[in-house]
Amino acid sequence: MAEKNWQGFFDMLMHHEGGFTDDQRDKGNSQGDGHGNEGSTMLGVTAFNWAKWTGKPAPKEVMRALTKDDVKPFYEKDYWTPIRGNDLYSGLDYSIADMAVNAGPSRGAKLFQRILGVTADGAIGNQTLKAMHDNDPLDLVEKYYDAREGFYRKLDDYSIYGKGWSRRNKETFEKSKTLIDL
């Protein structure tokens, strides 16, 4: 369905994720790599996740040196594939995959499953896909945007990061609408 969208999603993701950060207030960033190195993020990949992916320590100098080509397979395997991006409606794939990167694949999937009224187990399977096909793509993208915004507003650190999360959600929503096959 949406296999053609992987590269476009990755490009949009790189726009949102940007370069190197070391914000210890960020709960998604503050965990170290498990080897005594403080948490940092490059192109949206945390030191913890990069160390897990490579099986090697991820000190700041390693993180700063990461390139888009380095992280692309990581994002495809750990985010796009678990949310079954290739099986989702075009446009909806962007919305769910971006939430998966921002809040975890399971959360991204559960948000979608709640919208569909199916068991929210965090794994997009055949039941979820069947329910998706019983719904209008644009309606699902709109509902996902609203649900994602609601999720962010409930977070304790919304006062710190909310403006950026809301901007990202809106940009993803607008892009998602342009990709829907009507």
Over which residues does each language-model region extend?
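Cell-wall polysaccharide-cleaving catalytic domain and substrate-binding groove, primarily
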Residues: 1-182
